[in-house]
Regions:
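Compositional signal for N-terminal targeting/processing segments
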Residues: 1-223
């Protein structure tokens, strides 16, 4: 967790029971005024069970490739979540429930998923697509022992996260650019505006651990 000005920035793992507990603890103990989460409106409604059906017009909006990529990502998270008996996004739900308990305001700071997926499939190369699919197959089938040796219940160390993000940047530059870097800019800028507009308010932001380093660099430059 990082503290800067009136902001607490918490990096989480979307399938970690440890993240669920930490998020709830920080929000309740500090009695914050605003809880910002790494979701857009559509994903927020889906996570909270208020919007479960995927409509045809939504598939058209993000494209068939974007839709399939979204399903693949959700499936991978679900399989890993089963290992640790935690549903993907549980830490975001925990943040929302903790915010409701102390009557804190919820702020959705992520970029619209439709924009993100359109950007991804405009930038990604065939080479990266094949690498991505091969790495998933290799990870699930050939390196199961390595996954089992990694403690999915905990958020990896900052050093480990930095190495993983750098590896993504090197191996999948387009995926890094659209799924990490561009969203870092969007979320960090929204938080900076919020911090400046709500100077007297305590703000907790809950984002995936892979976003923290990049977001902190942007925030520090602008505060």
């Amino acid at each position: 967790m990082h503290k800067i000005g009136n902001l607490w920035l918490i990096g989480t793992s979307h399938i970690s029971p440890e993240s669920v507990k930490e998020v709830r603890k920080v929000i309740l103990e500090n009695e914050v005024d605003i809880v910002a989460i790494e979701l857009d409106k559509g994903r927020f409604l889906s996570l909270m069970g208020k919007k479960s059906k995927i409509r045809i017009r939504e598939i058209r909006r993000i494209g068939v490739k974007g839709f399939l990529f979204m399903l693949l990502g959700a499936w991978v998270e679900e399989q890993l979540g089963k290992v640790v008996k935690t549903k993907p996004g549980a830490e975001m739900k925990s943040a929302v429930k903790a915010a409701a308990k102390i009557k804190a305001r919820i702020a959705l700071i992520d970029q619209n998923i439709n924009i993100t997926l359109k950007r991804l499939f405009k930038e990604i190369t065939w080479k990266e697509k094949f690498r991505f699919i091969w790495d998933i197959v290799k990870g699930v089938v050939l390196r199961k022992q390595e996954i089992e040796g990694f403690d999915l219940r905990k958020v990896p160390s900052e050093n480990m996260i930095a190495k993983l993000v750098d590896k993504v940047k090197d191996r999948y530059p387009s995926i890094y650019k659209t799924l990490i870097h561009e969203r870092n800019i969007v979320m960090a800028n929204r938080l900076v505006k919020m911090m400046q507009r709500e100077e007297d308010k305590k703000i907790v932001a809950v984002v995936g651990a892979g976003h923290v380093r990049g977001m902190m660099e942007i925030i520090k430059k602008k505060i």
